[in-house]
Regions:
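Exported/periplasmic ABC-transporter solute-binding proteins
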Residues: 17-74, 81-253
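Positively charged n-region of N-terminal signal peptides that target proteins for export
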Residues: 1-4
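Bacterial N-terminal signal peptides
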Residues: 6-16
Length: 253
């Protein structure tokens, strides 16, 4: 999963070069962009649209954990990282977007609204049976991202108020795994970046607010990540061009 975005984008980049690509720089010489798993889908969507405008990508992309991405930038293994958590204070950093964190349940689950208190009780293990929320007698099965994932950090910051996740929670190593786990278990509930949400799971309301562009824009929806591009030094060349394009898209909305 961690390499899927990289190889997909490399394929698209090389395919766009066509037969006359003899002057194209080798992959080892192209600048490198790193993105964390929580924002992989956001970056993939952005780069797909960027390629439609520009015809090719002149940089490579890889997926790294938050800590690994910062270390790679510090060591100059990558020129730019896209993260959903605060970068070092002395680094170049620029906001790109806001990505919602969707709370998702199995489509067969009829409970469609959860307060922040409900979510804290569920993911801490204090609320263990669905009948406490008015549905059936099943045992609630929380599913959470791995420690260090930005969506998990933000969820714990906003929802958990210092409580630790229950030891009975399943760990999802990727958003794909999160969606698969929730889709497979009628009693499961999890959370993930909105760009990953599929028809196999159902997003629910949080404090009566459904996640969407308007509820993110006006601040009514409480769970979100700020998408930040960062590096020890401001990037140049192709990566700077992409950043300028992303920000221009945001200004036009």
């Amino acid at each position: 999963v961690a390499k899927r975005l990289l190889w997909t984008l490399l394929f698209l980049m090389l395919a766009s070069c066509g037969p006359s690509s003899s002057t194209t720089p080798t992959l080892d010489l192209l600048p490198r962009l790193a993105v964390t798993p929580a924002l992989e889908a956001w970056v993939a969507s952005s780069l797909t649209a960027y390629r439609e405008d520009h015809g090719s990508l002149e940089f490579t992309v890889e997926v790294l954990s938050y800590e690994a991405a910062l270390e790679a930038a510090e060591s100059e293994a990558v020129e730019l990282v896209v993260v959903g958590w605060e970068p070092p204070s002395d680094w170049f950093a620029t906001p790109l977007d806001v990505e919602g964190i969707a709370v998702v349940v199995n489509p067969g689950n009829p409970v469609r609204n959860y307060t922040l208190y409900d979510l804290a009780a569920i993911f801490s293990g204090r609320l263990r049976l669905w009948d406490e929320l008015g549905w059936g007698e099943g045992i609630v099965q929380p599913v959470i991202p791995l420690a260090g994932d930005e969506a998990r950090r933000r969820f714990e910051d906003v929802v958990m108020a210092g409580e630790s996740p229950t030891g009975n929670a399943l760990l999802a190593p990727s958003s794909e795994a999160m969606a698969a786990a929730v889709a497979a278990d009628p009693n499961a509930i999890g959370f993930m970046s909105m760009s990953y949400a599929t028809e196999d799971v159902r997003g629910v309301r949080v404090d009566g607010v459904l996640l969407g562009e308007s509820s993110l824009a006006d601040g009514r929806y409480p769970l979100w990540l700020e998408v930040i591009a960062t590096a020890p030094q401001e990037p140049t060349g192709a990566l700077r061009d992409w950043l300028a394009w992303v920000q221009a898209q945001g200004e036009g909305e």
